[in-house]
Amino acid sequence: MKKIAMFTMGTRGDIQPYIFLARGLVKNGYDVVLGSHPCWKDLVERAGIHFEPIGPDIDIEKEAAAIRGKNQNPALSMLKTMNFVFRIIQDSTHEIYEVCKGQDLIVVSHSQMGATEAEALGIPIVNVTLQKEMIPEKLKPQTFKDKLLGGMIGKQMAKPYNKIRKVYGLTPVKSSDEILSQKLNLIPISKYVLERNPYWEDHHILTGYWYEEDTDYTPDEKLVQFLESGEKPVILALGAMSFEDTSEKDKLDMFINAFQRAGCRAIIQGFQKTLKDYELPDTMIACGSVPHSWLFGQGCFVIHHCGFGTAAASMIYGIPSIPVPHVLDQMGFAKQLCDMNVATKPIHAGDLSETAIYEAIREMQISFDEKKKNAEAISEKIRKEGGVAEAVRLIDMNLK
């Protein structure tokens, strides 16, 4: 039995695709271990996947929210978050190295966690990339300015990896691109959502989204009664973006007031801390942790931060979106959904207000039929792709 280790860091939306891939690999006879933050142990093990804790035992979603709360500029916020993750990876390299021992293949996320340790052990890697901007355009003709700027950025990005490479006696790299697999990079996005970049090399492959239907989920009676009592509700699912303690109640107030102005019923996911002491109107209900595969089918449209996970789920399950992006990659996904006419114009975090939310809801209500039709048409195509099966097939080929 071939053994595969995969490593990733981040919020639940960053972890979930790897759980789906791991389950697909296990079903096809592989022995798989997933390494990530200790806080994700229960989530991974409930999915039947062997888990290895990597790094400090922290609530990564709240830690990331704290960084965002201190840095309102999206670019600076992303840079600070990356530095935070890099420190964890550097400090955890010996843990990662031990997990890599004896494996036949290492699956490496966009953080390149495990790539250097695999190289030190002579183990091949496969990359997974969630953001298209992270994929090098090696086939694009380079101007002098491109080369100069690319060299400066590459050198800066390589610094944290070179610190790890030094631990294992590996030669420094000039760019983080040199760490990437030259055989296979899996992009778990649908070709119906993202057009393949002609400047990518052949080993960068769009597989289709990775997901599963959560057929075992049963909603509680209170939620069922709410859904049966009126029209389909708006779903508010900000995930980790609802954790900023200093502004959480004010943010929730904005949404509730806007929903009432627009005459909307709503299901609210997230805001756990504030909702403990918050009396919601009868037209709204808090749902806690509910799988998107079930939840998104119950709503008319979804308001979300447009991270990889929720952007993917909105397309898979054919539900229009109001994006509220906080950081750069979310802004990219929000623009993509808007360009496909399955989402309204995004409300950027710095512009969030009751009026902005209300106006976005009105925009959605006016154009809903068209956006819903588009979302359902794309969903129908996506659900025929079999992204996990394609990723497993490509990994099979890579190991032969």
Residue ranges of model-derived segments:
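Short, charged, surface-exposed secondary-structure boundary motifs
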Residues: 60-67, 134-143, 215-218, 296-298, ...
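Conserved nucleotide-sugar donor-interacting segment of glycosyltransferase catalytic cores
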Residues: 86-151, 192
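Short gly/pro/ser/thr-enriched loop/turn and capping motifs at secondary-structure boundaries
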Residues: 41-42, 58-61, 115, 132-138, ...
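Short glycine/proline- and acidic residue-enriched helix-loop micro-motifs
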Residues: 73-84, 147-148
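Conserved nucleotide-sugar phosphate-binding/catalytic loop shared by glycosyltransferases and other
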Residues: 33-78
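Nucleotide-activated sugar donor-binding and catalytic core shared by glycosyltransferases
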Residues: 2-34, 39-51, 107, 142-143, ...
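A short helix->loop->beta-strand "cap" motif at the edges of active sites that frequently abuts
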Residues: 49, 121-124, 264, 319
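Donor-nucleotide binding loops and adjacent catalytic segments primarily
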Residues: 195-300
